[in-house]
Each structure stands twice: as structure tokens, then as C-alpha cells.
Amino acid sequence: MMSYYMDTTIGSTGPYPLARPGVMQGASSCCEDPWMPCRLQSACCPPRSCCPPWDEAAIQEVPTGLEHYSTDMECADVPLLTPSSKEMMSQALKATFSGFAKEQQRLGIPKDPQQWTETHVRDWVMWAVNEFSLKGVDFQKFCMNGAALCALGKECFLELAPDFVGDILWEHLEILQKEEAKPYPANGVNAAYPESRYTSDYFISYGIEHAQCVPPSEFSEPSFITESYQTLHPISSEELLSLKYENDYPSVILRDPVQTDSLQTDYFTIKQEVVTPDNMCMGRASRGKLGGQDSFESIESYDSCDRLTQSWSSQSSFQSLQRVPSYDSFDSEDYPAALPNHKPKGTFKDYVRDRADMNKDKPVIPAAALAGYTGSGPIQLWQFLLELLTDKSCQSFISWTGDGWEFKLSDPDEVARRWGKRKNKPKMNYEKLSRGLRYYYDKNIIHKTAGKRYVYRFVCDLQSLLGYTPEELHAMLDVKPDADE
């Protein structure tokens, strides 16, 4: 119900929302009150506050129209990042973060998110809603300027953002800030690309005969790569050597030998090696932090990822170590190695088969190890399910049915609880988890088995990715066919 009264400051009438009954001054917990009114030109919360405080004078502010949006945070068809075929992925990757650059140019949004007004923040959220087909987003939760938005911190931001897409939006915000903050390389290539940012986030394709890297324009046309990637532009090996790269997530950095002291990363420390046109050696990674969390989120599931990560980093390609995997990155032919004309042999099974640090009491397919192998960065839901399904201690609440890649959630609430614990989302439940599973339906990753409750089946080509047949896994886990089914 809206209340109508005269605003004496502007001399016109209009619908203004009344204060929400029962809201107390100074909410006890940040990011929990979505009923905060918007201000068009000034920040409604201090820079270090999660959400703007409620005050009586706020009802006198000019309405923005955002109060008419639903406050339902229901999320549907959120584009999670999953393995799939090249054909499906080439279509899905057309909707990229690079599309926001065009919006920035069209709407005059500053490149630095710190300079955004409330209107700019609203435009960014609207772009995300359209880009990822989000539904029921509560715009009032984002009534703040850019400085306040950036000051929220990841955990507080995730409380505001819709389920399953918060990590993506936060990374986009971080990328925008880092691109604005990065200095241009002090070399001759800078003149050729005066408006470029040289980060290996964009360096996703590598070959000795056709070496490519990405000096993306601020407003380049969208390409076929998702997330922060831009259109590839071929350059010569001489130009490649003069570029400086700073990788924000994976364990690979190409550095300008003259300016190594100026490069820093929050996630990995790198041992620099010589880069030549004929042999592009990769750095050796040590365990780091990603956004304040364990880099592979593997404390619970796998204790030996330090050694595995270090081993894989010397064999995986730039593409396979990207934080956000492309759909075609799960094909073995897309894993060029660091050495010229050499590709990693075998599958995930081959990487871990003979490793002494593989504990028999641990899952056959640790999610953290699989994430490191595929280069997906944060553990994805499908990887987490595979970890549980290959852990004998979890068979009481999730297990294979014995029919190929079909599995059953015997206790879906426990599966959701563990997923929430792994992703630091204590409010996770099966309803939210099932929305993630439903996204996999359209992408032909996982299908729901008709007529069977809580029974699903992997329909993608897991055997090629993992190197295991379902029968092999069943034998290793002592799985017996489910007679009841």
C-alpha cells in the first residue's frame, strides 16, 4: 500500500513508500534489511557499512521507482559454470562481461566503480539482471554509490546478491577496479594499445605457431569468451616478450623482467622463469589465498592439494588454469602444455593414479583436485557432487544407484548443508541447491530421472574427462545396484 502526500521541497505529489512497520533503528545485522529507500545522487550508507541505516528523514527522498520491483530473491536459470561440449559453450560464451563495456560507453558510467553514483550502481545491477536472466532481484538492497558498494567486502556483498551469481558479480566488480588501478606497461607496446589493460585473465589461448594474447580495448566488441575475457588479437613473439602480465587468479604469470618488483598478486607467489619465443615456461605456484578463502577450498575434502597444484601448474595450459572455465576447456585437445608441441597426456585419472599423496580414505575424485585439473577455480556444484559420490563415508546420504552415472540424494538436506558449508553459505537448503541442478538440465550436464524422487544422472561425457567408467567407480566404491529402484 502506497501513501500519497505533498513533498514541499519540490512542489509535487507522488507515491512514497511508508516506513516498514517494526523496523528498529540501527539494524543489528548488516545486509538484512531490504527496505532501505534509495537516494539518487549520494551514498545512503557509510563506506564501511554493509547496508544503509534506516532514518525517518529518508522517506522525504525523491523516489526512484525501484520500490516497485519485487523483493523476492528467487533466482532462476542462473548461468553457473559447468563442463559441456564446444558447441553448447560457443553459444553460451557470447554473453560476456565485455558487454558491460558497451553499457559504460552508452550510459556514461565511469570506468572506476569507486566513482559510481547510485544511478550507475543501479545500471550495473540492471545489466547483470539482463545478462544472466535473473528474476526477482531486490534492487533496494543495492541503493548505494560505488564507493559504498566496493567497501562492502565479499561476504557482505554475497548476502545482497542473488544465489549462485554473487561470486560472478563480485569478481566483475573486482576486475573493474583492478583494470582501472593497473598502470600501463612502460614499453613500446603501450603506444600500439593506448587504452588496453594487459592481464593474463585475457590470455587464454596459446600456441607456438600462433602465439596470441589479449590487449583488450576498454570498449571492444563482445567475444566468445565468458566472464572477463575479451577478443583475442594475434601478436608477434617479440611483442609478446615486451608485455607485462599480472594474473589475478591462476598460478601463471608472465612478467616484464625490468618491472618484476611492481607486480603483485593477492593469490599466488610466483617463481619467475625465463620466457623465450620458443619456450614459454610457466611459473611455479605456492599455496595462496583467494578472496580471503582457501585457494582450493580443500581443507575438508583433500589435504594434499598443495603438492597436486604445484605439479599440475607445470603441465596445465593458460586456458586450463583460468578461474572461469570455458566449456571447451574440458576437451583434452584444448590443453596445450608449457613445452612446445606437447600436450598433457591422459585424463584426470592419469594425473592422480600414481601419486603417493592420494589417500585411500579420501574421495576418489576430490572436488578441489578436479577443480585444479579443469581450471575452474572455485569448486562448482557438479564437482562437489562427484566428490561426495566417490567418498564411501557419504554413501548414507548420496550414492550411485548402480545404473551408469545415475545417483540418488538419499538425504538431500544433508547434501545441501554440506554444499552450504563448503561455499560458506549457511542458509543453503535443498530448494536452493535444486535450482542449481535445474540449470544443468538445459545444459545437458545433469538430468532428473523421471519417476524417481531425488534421483539424477550425469548425461555429459564424464568418462572422457575423468578417465573412469561408471563401472570402475562402482567397483572401487563397492556400489551395489539399487534393487528398490
Swiss-Prot record:
Region (Helix H5), start-end ranges: 470-476
Keyword Translocase: no
Helix HI-1: region residues: 348-356
SMART domains: ETS, SAM_PNT
Any one GO CC term of the record: cytoplasm
Region Helix HI-2, residue ranges: 367-374
SUPFAM superfamilies: SAM/Pointed domain, Winged helix' DNA-binding domain
Compartments it resides in: Nucleus; Cytoplasm
DNA-binding region range list: 379-459
GO molecular function, one term: DNA-binding transcription factor activity, RNA polymerase II-specific
PNT domain boundaries: 95-180
Family matches, as Pfam families: Ets, Ets1_N_flank, SAM_PNT
Principal location class: nucleus
UniProt superkingdom: Eukaryota
Entry keywords, A to Z: Cytoplasm, DNA-binding, Nucleus, Proto-oncogene, Transcription, Transcription regulation
Function: Transcription factor. Directly controls the expression of cytokine and chemokine genes in a wide variety of different cellular contexts.
Self-association state and partner proteins as the record states: Binds DNA as a homodimer; homodimerization is required for transcription activation.
Protein family per UniProt: Belongs to the ETS family.
Protein name as it appears in the record: Transforming protein p68/c-ets-1
Biological source species: Gallus gallus
Gene name as annotated: ETS1
